[in-house]
């Protein structure tokens, strides 16, 4: 089964702060890395634009990624509406 890589950009929504996002996303991270299909889940904050974040993710399969999206902790993060998704790239490792 092919692994799935994700690169996603998040931007803090109006009325929220990067501090709020970091607190919530750290909780999301702590639960996500325990998911069976999660190989890697890295959260990075842009140095020059602190209201922007990048997620680097590696999943065992598309089904594992979907299970992550459906997980209660992911849905709870989405419900906070702290960030908007600026892009999502599904990637395949070639070397």
Locations of regions flagged by a protein language model:
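Glycine-rich beta-strand-turn "strand-cap" elements at beta-sheet edges
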Residues: 2-4, 43-49, 77-95
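Active-site-flanking beta-strand signature of metal-NTP-handling nucleotidyl enzymes
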Residues: 5-11
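Short, surface-exposed ligand-recognition loops at beta-strand->loop->(often short) alpha-helix junctions
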Residues: 11-20
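An amphipathic, aromatic/His-enriched active-site/gating alpha helix that lines ligand/cofactor pockets
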Residues: 27, 33-36, 58-91
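Short, glycine- and small/hydrophobic-rich beta-strand elements in well-ordered beta-sheets
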Residues: 30-52
């Amino acid at each position: 089964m092919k692994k799935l890589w994700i690169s996603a950009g998040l931007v803090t929504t109006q009325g929220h702060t990067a501090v709020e996002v970091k607190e919530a996303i750290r909780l999301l991270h702590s639960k996500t890395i325990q998911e069976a299909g999660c190989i890697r889940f890295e959260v990075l904050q842009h140095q020059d634009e602190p209201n922007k974040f990048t997620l680097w993710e590696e999943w065992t399969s598309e089904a594992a990624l979907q299970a992550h999206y459906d997980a209660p902790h992911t849905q709870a993060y989405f419900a906070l509406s702290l960030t908007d998704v600026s892009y999502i790239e599904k990637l395949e490792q070639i070397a």
